[in-house]
Amino acid sequence: MNHLIIFAHPNSVRSFGRAIANRIEQISQENGVNVFFRDLYEMNFNPILSHEELQNANNGIIPEDIQQEHDFILQADLITLVYPLWWMGFPAILKGYLDRVLSHGFAYKTENGESVGLLKNKQMQQFITIGSNVDKYKEFGVDKSLNHCLINGLFNYCGIENVEFELFGDIHLIDDKARKAMIELAAQKTQAKLTALLKEKE
């Protein structure tokens, strides 16, 4: 079984998000799962979708670096995104990754005038760090907006259903004990996903 972890944070070594991603990688390896770890900043991923690339994608011509990401996604049974929420959206490098990688003909197609998602039979989870208070976000409905637009809205469009996500808030205010509890929650949720997927493959 294959697990694709996509991590986006400029502090690739010491960020809280990296600690979450590392723990998820560890729990996956402990389950005998093959892990593809994509650290977008460490890769120096180019997030700019050029006009030429957009036109080529519509004609089925894909750059080599994007084809590699396509291969990782196609092989993945579980896809995990770990990133900070900045200005109510993805970090620019992750947004650019999705712009370039979720291309027409790969992530979706047009059939009888309608878009059809092509990334079926895949599980996804997202762990999102925020500097603000999660309860305040929920009070204003931000969590629902994120779910409708960036999470299930975006990935349902590509054929991935029931995307689960967890917001980890107040990350600059909480102590190490609280951070460790959040990391272990991410590990527990990942373990539950892996257990269910491994059982399906028996």
Swiss-Prot record:
What's the top EC group for this one? oxidoreductase
Q: Name one Pfam family in it.
A: Flavodoxin_2
Q: Which GO terms describe its cellular component?
A: cytosol
Which keywords, in A-to-Z order, does the entry hold? Oxidoreductase
Give a GO molecular function annotation for the protein.
Answer: NAD(P)H dehydrogenase (quinone) activity
UniProt-listed InterPro entries? Flavodoxin_fold, Flavoprotein-like_sf, NAD(P)H_dehydrogenase_qn
Q: Which domain of life is it from?
A: Bacteria
Oxidoreductase keyword on record: yes
Q: What is its EC number?
A: 1.6.99.-
- Give the UniProt family note: Belongs to the NAD(P)H dehydrogenase (quinone) family.
Record's protein name: Uncharacterized NAD(P)H oxidoreductase HI_1544
